[in-house]
Amino acid sequence: MAGLLTLLGPAGRVSTRLRPLAPWLLGTATSCAPPLWALALSHPVPDARLLRTARGDCLSRQEPNRTPEPGGSVTGTEKKLSRTQQLKKVFQEYGAVGVSMHIGISLVSLGIFYTVVSSGIDMSAILLKLGFKESLVQSKMAAGTSTFVVAYAIHKLFAPVRISITLVSVPFVVRYFRSVGLFKPPATKP
């Protein structure tokens, strides 16, 4: 019952929480007060401050524009960025290295798909097995198209994979080149 009361915020709506529902139950050390039922047993008339801490507002007031990240940490006013926004951020942060890496990954991807398509492998069956919609695959594999156009269409279908590879690999490559001494370390902001 107390867990349900803690889960339900004011006015009975389900509230979003950034910490475990019942840290007192798990035995973790927190600065929170015990749940409502424990307050009712210990204090004949709990004051508003005790009720607020029992409701879950003891660590901090949750701002409406704060969002939890998968790792559990919270970004201030920053929302989760889309892949293209993350790619633009990498381009701004790493400059020519990020752009060069992404272009290189794209050219390698296009070359691989061109080789696969020109070798005669039925790519429509492979794409359907990978979970692409049949209408999308058939529109990309129109009859009478050249090998390069089909390879380019498949290359475009795999854009999220290329962007993910770029987002993961660019920081590692830059960090390696900085440790070797090919790149200067980033300038510290005053």
Swiss-Prot record:
Compartments where located: Mitochondrion; Mitochondrion outer membrane
Pfam families in UniProt: FAM210A-B_dom
Main location: mitochondrion
Induction field: Up-regulated by the erythroid transcription factor GATA1.
GO cellular component: membrane; mitochondrial outer membrane; mitochondrion
Transmembrane helix recorded as keyword: yes
Biased segments, Basic and acidic residues type: 56-66
Recorded topology in the membrane: Multi-pass membrane protein
Membrane-spanning intervals of the chain: 97-117, 148-168
Transit peptide: 1-58
GO aspect biological process, one term: reactive oxygen species metabolic process
Domain (DUF1279) ranges: 78-189
The entry's keywords: Differentiation, Erythrocyte maturation, Membrane, Mitochondrion, Mitochondrion outer membrane, Transit peptide, Transmembrane, Transmembrane helix, Tumor suppressor
Keyword Kinase: no
Tissues of expression: Expressed in late erythroblast differentiation stages.
Chain spans, region Disordered: 56-81
Function: Plays a role in erythroid differentiation. Involved in cell proliferation and tumor cell growth suppression. Involved in the metabolic reprogramming of cancer cells in a PDK4-dependent manner.
Recorded family membership: Belongs to the FAM210 family.
Stated name of the protein: Protein FAM210B, mitochondrial
Organism: Mus musculus (Mouse)
